[in-house]
């Protein structure tokens, strides 16, 4: 399912170096343009792929979305009702909803999209597991029947897997669907104006978007920048409106009016490939996790308030779940040394080719070296890291995950036997059984206990080594307002942005 994006031949190069004059041109034309960045390129614009999920919230629209205050609000749907038993959701679509080519958005577009996710064996098909049946009652009515009451279901409809696609476009594009942003149609706030692989893209306000009156900007210019210092320099020169900060820069900027922080729910963790002989033994995996100081790492390398993690379900995703579990630090150098010192392990660890990943990789590499473990770091673009993980071609891999919906299972389900994102060869029948029991448990307190037991078992098995829960420190132009950040689903929304250039 993971397809590589291609740039249309007619697409102009977006980045001609750092000496761009775009902001000045924006003012001349009285065009309101947000200038921002991403640290990695798009992988696909096919919602069934859903890996680069940030883009989907900008170009597509699901039944519901999170607004600027992180409240669930109607989107492509104008309203919904739920049956008394909590198992049937009926959505009434916005009659004004259109695709970017002017054709109406219909219930059949959603029904077909859901069916396609399953038929194409999308790695995200498991997100449709609660759904028993989807029916397009008429053009503006979609009925979704669930296997069981699912209290968090509405939040699931904000994610890419639940977004509509047009069957005629999919059939016309065939295997290339999602690889060229310019040949697709979109029902969200923005459409693609330009795309240049590994350099960036420009989004333009969708003239057919039903809620276009509330989209206050004309374009979003997104550059692909992997060097945080370059991003800061571009921010300082007025060529970026938003730039992330690393630990070296937080102290410099923390008292400035452009300085901002946001606590999100993205978890970073190390996958441990149990198919590798060196990592089959649970004690070895536990020793690797115990060998590095997560607290010192987050304070010295990140310095932005990110939390050291000895858990995989992020804090504050569900306060009730937080109350149902206990978290203990796993850091124990002496215990790690007893297991690792005489093994003379040689391991390869995959990291992405951004500055933060490299620093974390080097920190863990250094800590394990002290325990006589030789770790070779392999720095790769995100797409290549994912491909290596998918093939099982690694020992350790620094990965991350943000919640697709507002429930602990958005993390815990990843590690069940057979889940496409369980790329470590991990399988525990008791773990699977606990999650299956939680699936059918209607008493929410009992359900949370089952889930917390599953998390404890996963961590005791050391299928993964949790590293940290991210907090973002970033610079944002004070002329830019309402750049919404989310801790569930996609990270960010451009829809609500307002710009007043001075």
Regions found by a protein language model. Name each.
Residues 37-82, 115, 185:
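N-terminal lobe/hinge region of extracytoplasmic solute-binding protein
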Residues 50, 159-215, 219:
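Gly/Pro-rich hinge or "lid" segments in bacterial periplasmic/extracellular proteins
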Residues 81, 126-170, 194:
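Surface-exposed binding/hinge segments that line
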Residues 208-251:
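Ligand-site clamp/hinge motif
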Residues 275, 279-317, 359-360, 455-463:
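Periplasmic-binding protein-like
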Residues 303-341, 356:
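Structural transition elements
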Residues 376, 381-385, 413-479, 502:
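Extracytoplasmic/peripheral linker and loop segments enriched in polar/acidic and small residues
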Residues 474-502:
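Long beta-strand-rich cores associated with HINT superfamily self-processing modules
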